[in-house]
């Protein structure tokens, strides 16, 4: 069985979002939305939009901290020449399915740009 983190990296590498790696009750904490986004279908909508915006030719991981059931993935990318630095915090269960995903983005100018650009894909 592939690990949750291997599955995540495969999705990023292939620029796809795969619901089979998610628990039915997954929660996504977006930097733009006050309440967590719940359920595979809703989370898929946001991840597909984020994938189109953030996962571009400039996207790269700069660090990774992986534990038994969670990981911090630090990334960098650019949109319209604006530097973006962010963190994915991912939690998974014993079945290697994602149960929680949190995204943090900085600086504020980048956060605003990502929000505006993603809203066009939602």
Model-derived segments and spans:
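C-terminal and inter-domain tail/linker signature
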Residues: 1-122
């Amino acid at each position: 069985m592939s690990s949750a983190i291997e599955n995540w990296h495969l999705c990023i590498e292939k620029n796809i979002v795969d619901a089979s790696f998610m628990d039915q009750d997954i929660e996504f904490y977006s930097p733009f939305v006050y309440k967590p986004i719940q359920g595979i279908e809703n989370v898929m909508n946001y991840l597909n939009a984020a994938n189109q915006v953030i996962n571009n030719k400039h996207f790269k991981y700069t660090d990774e901290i992986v534990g038994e059931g969670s990981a911090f993935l630090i990334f960098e990318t650019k949109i319209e020449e604006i530097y973006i630095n962010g963190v994915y915090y991912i939690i998974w269960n014993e079945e290697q399915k994602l149960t929680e995903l949190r995204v943090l983005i900085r600086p504020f100018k980048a956060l605003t740009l990502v929000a505006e650009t993603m809203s066009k894909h939602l």
